[in-house]
């Protein structure tokens, strides 16, 4: 049993399709909204929605921070997730970290997307590669969390 619970951590989950329906219901046209250049994430942070994105971010962090760790990731998606988990369960998985995305190719190819997979992937890649922050540790937003104690127990937050 887990020593803490997260049952209250999420209030709602929406797919892009549901978000689009809300926009339509409230007559919101995203193309008429003022454009804002959001460039506070590294290319690695922006790629979390694609299979292998989290693994790439961790590899970049390990390389840049100099931390010594035996990182043997197994990025997997789609039906391969079940096979990967079964191999891990019986001790036959060659890695020590599983990045599992239930949707083949990651969230960008999920059931709730509103664009064809190839078009979504191309747009995703173009936007992500346009970022000026090319390393995890170069993200200035991290400075806002320097005082966060990652060793605390959840009961200490109360």
Predicted features by range, described:
Residues 1-158:
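Iron-sulfur-associated redox domains of electron-transfer enzymes in respiratory
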């Amino acid at each position: 049993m887990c020593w803490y619970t997260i049952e209250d951590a999420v209030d709602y989950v929406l797919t892009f399709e549901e978000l689009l329906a809300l926009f339509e219901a409230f007559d919101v046209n995203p193309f008429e909204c003022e454009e804002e250049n959001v460039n506070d994430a590294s290319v690695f942070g922006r790629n979390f929605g694609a299979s292998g994105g989290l693994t790439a971010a961790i590899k970049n962090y390990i390389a840049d921070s100099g931390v010594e760790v035996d990182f043997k990731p197994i990025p997997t998606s789609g039906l391969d997730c079940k096979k990967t988990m079964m191999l891990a369960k019986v001790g036959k998985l060659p890695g020590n970290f599983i990045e599992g995305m239930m949707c083949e190719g990651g969230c960008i190819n999920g059931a709730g997307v509103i664009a064809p997979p190839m078009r979504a992937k191309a747009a995703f890649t173009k936007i992500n590669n346009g970022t000026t922050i090319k390393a995890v540790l170069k993200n200035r937003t991290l400075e806002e969390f320097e005082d966060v104690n990652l060793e605390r127990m959840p009961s200490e937050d109360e």
